[in-house]
Amino acid sequence: PTLLPWATVAQNVRLPLRLKNIEYQESRVQEALTLVGLGDFRDAYPRELSGGMKMRVSIARALVTRPQLLLMDEPFAALDEITRFKLNDDLLALWRQLNCTVVFVTHSVFESVYLSTRILMFTPRPGRVAAEFDVEAPEPRAGTFRTSPAYGAQCREVSAALANVMAET
């Protein structure tokens, strides 16, 4: 995540409001920080945060404008697996709470099946839709889904399609 190193967490989250000339409302910043579990870190600086916390600040910064569409391009790719699993669960909780559309780009078959209700697989250049999958999963999802036979079957199905796309290129 790209954060302003000289700015506090709250100042980083406030940035989109300033850029869009939206009247500053402290309550919106605090609400976004609370949503991502960082309400107590508003006065911290990025250098004082873990990688997962920095990612949460970036998510709060995106949420402060109350978007109807959230675009996320590999936001968890550089994180360790434990942090990634936690943020996956947090993202699902936010999605349910905010009721907004999330377009999530990932290179992880496992992450795509866990997070998605629908998966679009693209070909390499030029990018075209190569396959589409509807993910059948219980709602709300829980960590136990990752160890279920249904999850394993869907991961195998998506992996097989990925292997076919790779063989064609």
Q: Model-predicted segments: where are they?
A:
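Conserved ABC ATPase "signature" region
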Residues: 22-41, 93
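ABC-type ATPase nucleotide-binding domains, specifically the catalytic core motifs of the NBD
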Residues: 4-26, 35
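Helical segment within the ABC ATPase nucleotide-binding domain
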Residues: 84-98
